[in-house]
Regions:
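Short Lys/Arg-rich basic patches
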Residues: 4-30
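Non-catalytic regulatory/interaction regions at protein termini and inter-domain linkers
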Residues: 11, 15, 54, 58-60, ...
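Short, positively charged interaction helices/loops
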Residues: 64-103
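Amphipathic, hydrophobic secondary-structure cores in small proteins
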Residues: 21-74, 79
Length: 103
């Protein structure tokens, strides 16, 4: 079992900081490349650029919770939720939001 984790590509767990604007405010987010790849995939399936997807997600969390605590951790957890969904969910949710920020 440990081989599965130990032999993963080093690139997947290397960190990268990306700068973006959310509601006109410049910010930077540091995540491991595996998470950035997953977020790019989600954004693509939603038909959005990564920046637009992250802005939408941020706004949804803000609307639901009134504030956003630790957005980077929320993004990691969102990726875990996305990756844990069975393939059938993707077919069932086609045409509807695939990832609701408040989940």
């Amino acid at each position: 079992m440990c081989r599965l984790f130990a032999h993963q590509p080093a690139r997947d767990y290397e960190s990268q900081t990306r700068s973006l604007r959310i509601d006109g405010h410049a910010t930077s987010i540091r995540l491991e490349m595996g998470f950035w790849d997953t977020l790019e995939e989600i954004a693509g399936k939603e038909g959005k650029s990564l920046a637009k997807f992250l802005t939408q997600l941020y706004r949804e969390v803000l609307d639901y919770h009134g504030e956003v605590h630790n957005f980077a951790s929320l993004l990691r957890c969102s990726c875990l939720i996305y990756r844990s969904r069975p393939v059938q969910d993707e077919v069932r949710f086609r045409g509807e939001p695939r990832l609701v920020a408040a989940e």
